[in-house]
């Protein structure tokens, strides 16, 4: 009496391995799309938070009649006096200092060196803010009258989000 062998043939095993390979390839592509979308959403959220924070803090100065203090850092230290609100780049500097703990969702550190902070002080030109190594950074600058916020979604000026609000 001959025993019947049990098991899978080589062809069956190869088919299973091929199916697993196809599923893995599709899953990696889909996962990559989800993570890039999440990073872009986080950068947009940082952008909106900067605008809301700066506007809310500047309104405090308006409520107090232009006196007192606004924009305190998380450690409670004063970053901007209401009397300096109209001074060139003072609102931007205070905003960057107050939101110092925001991290870059892309994890990109500038090619020139530096850190992984998401909110940075801009140079004063919306057209030149995004360059190599700036993906995920939100740049804040003001000219004394207008606060400009620009977020870079790639290392080029084409894929950005820009906003501005009046400095009051």
PLM segments and residue spans:
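Periplasmic/extracellular, small/polar-rich flexible segments of pilin-like filament-forming proteins
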Residues: 56-168
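Short, contiguous, well-ordered secondary-structure segments
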Residues: 1-3, 56
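Intrinsically disordered, low-complexity segments enriched in small/polar residues
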Residues: 6, 29-32, 51, 104, ...
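Membrane-proximal N-terminal amphipathic helix
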Residues: 39-65
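Compositionally biased, intrinsically disordered low-complexity segments
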Residues: 18-20, 29, 53, 94, ...
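General helical secondary-structure elements
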Residues: 2, 35-36, 40, 48, ...
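N-terminal single-pass transmembrane signal-anchor helix
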Residues: 3-35
């Amino acid at each position: 009496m001959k025993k019947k062998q049990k098991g899978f043939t080589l062809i069956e095993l190869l088919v299973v391995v091929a199916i697993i390979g196809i599923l893995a390839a599709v899953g990696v592509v889909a996962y990559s799309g989800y993570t890039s979308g999440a990073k872009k959403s986080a950068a947009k959220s940082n952008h909106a938070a900067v605008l809301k924070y700066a506007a809310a803090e500047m309104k405090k100065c308006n409520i107090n009649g232009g006196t007192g203090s606004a924009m305190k850092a998380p450690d409670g230290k004063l970053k901007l006096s209401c009397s300096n609100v109209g001074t060139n780049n003072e609102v931007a500097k205070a905003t960057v200092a107050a939101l110092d703990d925001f991290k870059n969702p892309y994890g990109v550190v500038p090619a020139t060196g530096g850190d992984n902070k998401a909110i940075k002080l801009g140079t004063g030109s919306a057209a030149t803010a995004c360059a190599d190594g700036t993906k995920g950074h939100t740049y804040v600058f003001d000219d004394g009258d207008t606060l400009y916020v620009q977020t870079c979604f790639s290392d080029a000026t084409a894929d950005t989000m820009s906003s501005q609000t009046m400095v009051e």
